[in-house]
Amino acid sequence: MSLITSSGAFAQKIVVAHRGASGYLPEHTLEAKAMAYAMGADYIEQDVVMTKDDQLIVIHDITLDRTTDVGEQFPGRARADGKHYVIDFTLAEIRQLAASEGARIVNGQRVQGYAARFPMRTSSFRISTLAEELELIQGMNKSTGRDIGIYPEIKSPEFHLAEGKDLGRAVVAELKAYGYASKEQKVFLQTFSWEEVKRLRDEILPEAGIDLKLVMLVGDDEEYQWMFNESGMQEVGRYADGFGPDKSLLIAPDSTPGNLKISNLVELAHSNGMQVHPYTFRADAGQVAKWAGSFEEMLEAFFFEAGIDGAFTDFPDRAVEFLRQR
């Protein structure tokens, strides 16, 4: 499907597989990406972090602890805060780690983040490089005749720069090497850093000789509040083609079935030429909005009452089917 980004008129609504089909398989594994592809997602997300030897890997956190067995494989390698940072390990070392469904620490024990998902520490999964994932998606595009897009995120660019690594420039170089060069292609490049969005638009992309659609990710944090009005959104729209808010910024969590408290952020973004792709839609117990009777009712409200253009979801099959039925 074509995407129109130069005006307020946008193409068909899209489904973005958040960390792949992460509701069914461990996040950011190639298996989760292949499943998302087969489920019909329009775009597949890649969170990108850099290793000690400047390799680009696909992982959500800048640390390895939540989704791997790094503490067991490499004792004594944590920083003072007790965490194992990707940037302190080479790709060869990271290849030795087992990837797994995410965990949190409760009373010193690892507890699976979402209890009903793929069992933690079972089967065999690995962390992949950005290149490997791009080759997987492009390979399936060739073998199926489809054109499924990519949605990479530059993770914590300021952290990387402070460590002497220009992650944004490296990601753009990798995308260019794999043929992503224009806004007409199915690629969105996202980040939570306003400074990085400006640097990408003003410096990195022009120097690389390519032009990609950029998405400004935002949370409900003080640093983003200036964007949530006409003048702020106009400034964001000078640099970004898309606006990626936490979904709670669009429909207030304390809404009720008969009274949805819908903000004006979608309207503001659209009037400034940006698509709106909020995150994250989950069907797990406790993750469906209290004002919605089901996952699908939640999607209905966001897509057709709030007016979003696309959604990040851990359950791409259900979102795809919802839009097909709609």
Where on the chain are the PLM-derived regions?
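Bacterial N-terminal signal peptides
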Residues: M1-T5
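Phosphate-group recognition and catalysis centered on beta-loop-alpha active-site segments
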Residues: S7-R326
